[in-house]
Amino acid sequence: ENLAKIAAMIGQTDNSRPAAAGLPRLAIEQQNETSEGDVLPKGSFRLRMGDQSIYAKELEVRLFVRYYSYDLWNNANPELSIRTVLAPSLSDDFPDTSGGNKCGKLSKDEVANLSSNSIEHAKQKSIKCTQVVYGVVTSADGSKTIDGEDVDVKGTPFVWSARGSAFMPVANHIREVPSNKIMFGQKAKVTTKRNVNG
């Protein structure tokens, strides 16, 4: 056992995770249940680490960096979906995988001039802007697996694609960081709140 640890420490063996594993992904659980019928805590934060998901109602995090991206998802053929590069400002150029910019996203004024029942108007509504945020969990009281097993996720790095109802709260938090402070030095408590539409 000690020999194996020493071999790993000096680089003799490669104990790294597979490259495809990537960073754990933070999201807000949108589903009510799994495909097997297990109940999921909809509205809780989900931290997907490999093939395991950990849930928490509230997290404390430090956000290190925020980028923006656009995508136009193709449900029929996901491999034909269009995505842009990541950029730190909405005023930056966003070259996309189709050779265009911002997946073809028009300005608000241009969209307002489109007929509401046109194909282009429908396409514009399908182009989504996402904030891609990299951070680390500083505390997560009550974080558990779906089976109720307690898991300590303190110190876990994550990537969070904040879009939809999560977009503005993240943007507002970053905007409110005082100009004499750096975002990654600030801890933030993040919670979810159920909104009823309609």
Segments from the language model and where they lie:
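OB-fold ssDNA-binding interfaces and closely related basic DNA-contact patches used
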Residues: 1-151, 196-197
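Extended serine/threonine-enriched, polar tracts that run as long, contiguous segments within proteins
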Residues: 129-198
